[in-house]
Amino acid sequence: MSEKRLHELSVEIGAALKAKGWWVTCAESCTGGLIAKAITDIAGSSAWFDRGFVTYSNAAKHELLGVSESTLEQYGAVSEQVVHEMALGVLHAAGADVAVSVSGIAGPDGGSAEKPVGTVWFGFAGKDGRVLTAKQQFSGDREAVRLQAAVFSLQTALREFIKN
């Protein structure tokens, strides 16, 4: 996984979104803005990207995206239920056509037997009401996990929502 691949995906997503007149948004936790950075590294990205959110804390997920406090308490931030609510929340907050959300444990600390370091949950939502969630287990150091998560996010958004 490389930054070059992330850049290539951003270019491809930008072209596809521009052709459709669509907007994409993102709500990031463990990637800390890496997805938004990759998108905005592309010249002209203001034609398909208006805003993204870095919601690192549970309070930010709740306050900015409307993730239920009970969902956060019951399932934890790194869960299918939370990324589902994050994706819908950011889609609504940004008024976008496609939304990506990500929450995971990049390491080196913070993992558990149930959710080891490298566990990342993803949420994707479209203005058509469709929501998709996915879980991945990545290996490597913190930077590698974050990069793999950003690439997976863009690959999946492109394949399942933008080109579909």
UniProtKB/Swiss-Prot annotation:
BP term (GO), one: pyridine nucleotide biosynthetic process
Gene Ontology terms, MF aspect: nicotinamide-nucleotide amidase activity
Free-text function comment from the UniProt entry: Has NMN aminohydrolase activity, not active on other substrates.
The protein's enzyme class: hydrolase
Superkingdom per UniProt: Bacteria
Protein name in UniProt: Nicotinamide-nucleotide amidohydrolase PncC
InterPro entries (alphabetical): CinA-like_C, CinA_C
Reactions catalysed, as given in the entry: beta-nicotinamide D-ribonucleotide + H2O = nicotinate beta-D-ribonucleotide + NH4(+)
Entries under Gene3D superfamilies matching the protein: CinA-like
Keywords: Hydrolase, Pyridine nucleotide biosynthesis
Gene: pncC
Subunit structure: Homodimer.
One Pfam family linked to the record: CinA
Coiled coil (residue ranges): none
Protein family membership: Belongs to the CinA family. PncC subfamily.
UniProt-listed Enzyme Commission number(s): 3.5.1.42
